[in-house]
């Protein structure tokens, strides 16, 4: 009997000890989906990670966009759609591989079993609290240690996007990549590839704020940076890159801690850009394209009269603003500002709020310099709407977070159309205020390149370093109202970085402050057709 009890105890103990470890592989293949539940995005993804040979294959939407990184050859091929055709470009230079597995498994805490996607899993977690913002991260493996799901409630570990809920599901995973060697064959389409200018690796750089001791010695800072890399799955391709990231990391900590230690109308909070240089941040979130010399606007809104308009406007109160959307890891901000203005002004004119398709603009509005996820302008969007007649609804032509083939020849239009569009007098905040009050939400371009804008959390943003020249504008947003908060005038601005950024997706931009950040430098709105 005692032997039986001892045997049973040993069996029980062996079961307790048989907890699979988090995977750590130098080579692997995975197939699954990358999901953003907030905006109902389910992006099929196929990825080969090969740190042994310093190369990588990434395909999304079943081959709609393919990136093959040959960092061992200082070259990258990208195959993707441009309006109705697939094209190939090649980009010289090195970069960092995208690893979807935790690089420091020992820093994760085991927290028991559960069921995910119908599979009994073993979960590991991290909880990271920084400047009032807490992120929760869970990595689930099956009994054999095979990844099942990476759940991120905070910053996107994988591709380095703003705080949100991200879910990476693994359908297939193997560390034997020999069967997938053909994936690294250069596509035939790339025989005539066009060379794109070299740019910073768009997948580099996540965030952290590990402590706020500005007097820390270099050794202490180095230890904090080590924790940062472990917590946020950071890998750098060389010692030189590591040293550069360390400098950026220390600078980000200083920016936030220094700002929040003083009196200010707004507060900052850490997010996923702390080890990025300004150039990298601009490339990742706000790609700039050549500005069109002619906008094609029908007229200019130059009415600066403030006598007969309300002292406060918020078009959400009239149900003329759709919920905050999420551009994800795509430089498509220009489409969200444009659809937001068309949605709002159509609502004011016709009394109906219709959520319109940003993806149709990404895929089809290849006009006057606009390049889908590579950036663009509201004027291009409105010119396209005039040309095509009407955009589809968001539900009929849903957002992909990715350039796609244009479907405007087959998709059902929404019926929302415009007769033209109007530019607001450049630099006139009173004209912008009048336009918002009398016509509805207005698409505006701002300078979002100042370091602290990416960390904005609350209050009236009024950093004097923010510029207002036309060539300084790098991010399209939507002005939906104005008012005064704690004695400071503001424009109420809707961003496209989900509700996890700022004040549930919104920011108070300083008003009557010398056109700070260029809020009125390039404001545009459409003229909806009256039903």
From Swiss-Prot:
Signal peptide: 1-18
Cystine pairings recorded for this chain: 330-373, 364-406, 466-517
Cell location: Secreted
One family name in Pfam for this protein: Inhibitor_I29
Keyword Phosphoprotein: no
Gene null: resulting phenotype: Cells proliferate more rapidly than wild type cells and exhibit supernumerary centrosomes and a cytokinesis defect. They also produce fewer spores at culmination. Form large fruiting bodies with large spore heads.
Database matches in PROSITE patterns: THIOL_PROTEASE_CYS, THIOL_PROTEASE_HIS
Biological processes annotated in GO: G protein-coupled chemorepellent receptor signaling pathway; immune response; negative regulation of asexual reproduction; positive regulation of apoptotic signaling pathway; protein localization to plasma membrane; proteolysis; sorocarp morphogenesis
Residues linked to a glycan: 94, 111, 423
InterPro entries, A to Z: Papain-like_cys_pep_sf (IPR038765), Pept_cys_AS (IPR000169), Pept_his_AS (IPR025660), Peptidase_C1A (IPR013128), Peptidase_C1A_C (IPR000668), Peptidase_C1A_papain-like (IPR039417), Prot_inhib_I29 (IPR013201)
Alphabetical keyword list: Disulfide bond, Glycoprotein, Secreted, Signal
Gene Ontology CC terms, in alphabetical order: cytoplasmic vesicle; extracellular region; extracellular space; lysosome
SMART domains according to UniProt: Inhibitor_I29, Pept_C1
Catalytic residues identified in the record: 333, 475, 495
SUPFAM superfamilies (alphabetical): Cysteine proteinases
Keyword set includes Membrane: no
Subunit structure, as described in the record: Interacts with aprA.
Family stated for the protein in its record: Belongs to the peptidase C1 family.
Summary of the function given for this chain in its UniProt record: Inhibitor that slows proliferation of secreting cells (also known as chalone). Requires aprA for activity.
Name by which UniProt lists this protein: Counting factor associated protein D
């Amino acid at each position: 009997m005692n032997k039986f009890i001892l045997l049973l105890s040993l069996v029980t103990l062996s079961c307790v000890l048989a907890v699979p470890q988090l995977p750590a592989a130098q080579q692997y293949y995975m197939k699954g989906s990358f999901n953003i539940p907030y905006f109902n995005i389910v992006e099929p993804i196929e990825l080969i990670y090969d740190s042994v040979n310093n190369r990588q294959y990434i395909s999304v939407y079943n081959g709609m966009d393919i990136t093959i990184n040959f960092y061992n050859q200082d070259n990258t091929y990208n195959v993707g759609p441009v309006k109705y055709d697939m094209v190939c470009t090649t980009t010289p230079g090195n970069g960092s591989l995208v690893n979807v597995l935790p690089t420091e498994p020992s820093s994760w805490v085991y927290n028991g079993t559960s069921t995910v996607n119908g599979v009994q899993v073993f979960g590991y977690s991290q909880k990271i609290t920084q400047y009032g913002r807490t992120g929760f991260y869970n990595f689930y493996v099956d009994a054999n240690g095979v990844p099942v799901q990476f759940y991120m409630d905070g910053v996107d570990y994988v591709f380095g996007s703003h705080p949100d809920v991200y879910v990476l599901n693994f359908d297939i995973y193997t560390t034997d990549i020999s069967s997938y060697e053909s994936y690294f064959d250069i596509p035939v389409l790339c025989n005539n590839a066009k060379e794109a200018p070299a740019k910073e690796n768009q997948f580099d750089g996540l965030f952290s704020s590990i402590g706020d001791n500005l007097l820390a010695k270099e050794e202490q800072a180095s230890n904090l940076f080590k924790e940062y890399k472990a917590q946020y799955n950071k890998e750098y391709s060389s010692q030189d890159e590591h040293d550069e990231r360390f400098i950026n990391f220390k600078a980000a900590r200083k920016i936030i801690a220094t700002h929040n230690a003083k009196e200010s109308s707004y507060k900052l909070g850490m997010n996923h850009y702390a080890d990025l240089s300004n150039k990298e941040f601009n490339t990742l979130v706000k790609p700039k394209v050549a500005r069109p010399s002619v906008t094609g606007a029908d007229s200019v809104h130059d009415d600066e009269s403030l006598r007969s308009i309300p002292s406060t406007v918020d078009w959400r109160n009239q149900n003329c603003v759709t919920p905050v959307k999420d551009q994800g890891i795509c430089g498509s901000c220009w489409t969200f500002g444009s659809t937001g203005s068309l949605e709002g002004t159509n609502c004011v004119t016709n009394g109906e709020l219709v959520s319109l398709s940003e993806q149709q603009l990404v895929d089809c509005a290849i006009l006057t310099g606009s390049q889908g996820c590579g950036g663009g302008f509201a004027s291009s969007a409105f010119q396209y709407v005039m040309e095509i007649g009407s955009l589809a609804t968001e539900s009929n032509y849903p957002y992909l977070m990715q350039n796609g083939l244009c479907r405007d020849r087959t998709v059902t239009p929404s019926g929302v159309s415009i007769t033209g569009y109007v530019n607001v007098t450049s630099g006139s905040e009173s004209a912008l205020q009048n336009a918002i009050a009398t016509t509805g939400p207005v698409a505006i371009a701002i300078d979002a390149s100042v370091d602290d804008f990416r960390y904005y959390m609350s209050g009236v943003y009024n950093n004097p370093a923010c510029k207002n020249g036309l060539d300084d504008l790098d991010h399209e947003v939507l002005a939906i109202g104005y008012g005064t908060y704690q004695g400071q005038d503001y424009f109420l601005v809707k961003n496209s970085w989900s509700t996890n950024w700022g004040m549930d997706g919104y920011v108070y931009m300083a008003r009557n402050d010398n056109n700070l950040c260029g809020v009125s430098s390039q404001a545009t709105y459409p003229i909806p057709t009256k039903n």
